[in-house]
């Protein structure tokens, strides 16, 4: 099957490579000519512009966008004048599901199909495959099934869920048509919110282990320092690298994210290459908003998001104000760091 890919970053480029390896024909475009040339060497057909890309596609055209969420509307606006009834636009990035609903409505008068795909797999997807959560009209999704099947990881060696043989479907192959437009990105949005929470749990747990030697450290004796009453209970010098590794082997918290944690700690146990400023790309915020609208309590996911804000210094003013209030209330002098 033929597919166009716009956006040849880490994920887009590797998705093209996986599709070519699976026997599909890919036409590619990116703002970087080098990115296009690199994939042309891997047997993709390069395009010099969006117009050139559309001209090289057979009808009905299938065009996959793998661009930042902020660039999707502009890219669609540039493409639409060159597309025709029956063509399919796929947004495989991390767009807000509300925008998917709007875009599908705007494209409907031109009979251009819009499909949203929440794509998980990151830089590992070339070899492992991509988990895909899909939203859009049934006919368009069915037409794209050969693409999804190639990109997906397949059943692999994951044991089948008991009773799954009676259900069937594509979910156990790693891709799922979740529902109408927006459903794919809605499910991916919550997936990423959960990811925030899991990552935060590992980070907090490892931080406790790292401070299990606090009893060996000298603590200031003053009104601003909480005394450690039983320092003899905190005398452990724990090897986080090895703990992460042993947890990978049969523990109930084993996961791919723990695998990556173990890899990071093996490369650099002190994590000296990281400052601890954790970004968020929007999905966590949207997840919390959906939870508020539906009156669903999500304390773990919301706390994980707020901690990302705090890591970037977003709480600095509030923390300063807390110190100011403590000083005015009781004359508490702020301690210096270190």
Where in the sequence are the language-model features?
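Short beta-strand and adjoining strand-loop segment in the mid-core
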Residues: 27, 128-152, 188-196
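NAD(P)-dependent Rossmann-like dehydrogenase/reductase catalytic/cofactor-binding core
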Residues: 2-8, 17, 149, 156-189, ...
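Hydrophobic beta-strand scaffold residues
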Residues: 26, 46, 89, 113-115, ...
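NAD(P)+-binding Rossmann beta1-loop-alpha1 motif at the extreme N-terminus of oxidoreductases
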Residues: 1-62, 86, 123-126, 327
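Rossmann-fold NAD(P)-binding glycine/threonine-rich loop
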Residues: 85-88, 92-141
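Beta-loop-alpha module in the N-terminal Rossmann-like domain of NAD(P)-dependent dehydrogenases
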Residues: 51, 63-79, 96-99
């Amino acid at each position: 099957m033929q597919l166009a890919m716009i956006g040849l970053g880490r994920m887009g480029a590797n998705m093209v490579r996986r599709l070519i390896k699976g026997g599909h024909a890919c036409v590619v475009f990116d703002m970087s000519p080098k990115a296009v040339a690199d994939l042309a060497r891997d047997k993709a057909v390069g395009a010099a512009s969006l117009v050139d890309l559309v001209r090289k596609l057979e009808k009905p055209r299938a065009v996959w966008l793998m661009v930042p969420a902020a660039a999707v509307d502009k890219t669609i606006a540039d493409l639409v004048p060159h597309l025709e009834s029956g063509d399919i636009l796929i947004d495989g990035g991390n767009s807000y599901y509300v925008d998917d609903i709007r875009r599908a409505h705007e494209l409907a008068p031109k009979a251009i199909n819009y499909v949203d795909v929440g794509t998980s797999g990151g830089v590992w997807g070339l070899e492992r495959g991509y988990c895909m959560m899909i939203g859009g009209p049934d006919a368009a999704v069915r037409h794209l099934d050969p693409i999804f099947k190639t990109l997906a990881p397949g059943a692999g060696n994951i044991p089948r869920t008991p009773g799954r043989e009676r259900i069937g479907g594509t979910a156990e192959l790693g891709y799922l048509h979740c529902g109408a437009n927006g459903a794919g990105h809605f499910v991916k949005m919550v997936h990423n919110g959960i990811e925030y929470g899991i990552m935060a749990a590992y980070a907090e747990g490892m931080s406790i282990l790292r401070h299990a030697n606090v009893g060996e450290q000298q603590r200031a004796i003053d009104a601003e320092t909480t005394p450690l009453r039983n320092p003899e209970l905190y005398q452990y010098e724990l090897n986080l690298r090895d703990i992460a590794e042993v947890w990978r082997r049969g523990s109930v918290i084993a996961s791919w994210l723990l695998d990556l944690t173990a890899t990071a700690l093996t490369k650099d146990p002190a994590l000296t290459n990281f400052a601890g400023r954790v970004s968020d790309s929007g999905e966590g915020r949207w997840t919390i908003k959906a939870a508020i609208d539906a009156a669903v309590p999500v304390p773990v996911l919301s706390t994980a998001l707020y901690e990302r804000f705090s890591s970037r210094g977003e709480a600095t003013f509030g923390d300063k104000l807390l110190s100011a209030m403590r000083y005015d209330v009781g004359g508490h002098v702020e301690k210096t760091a270190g």
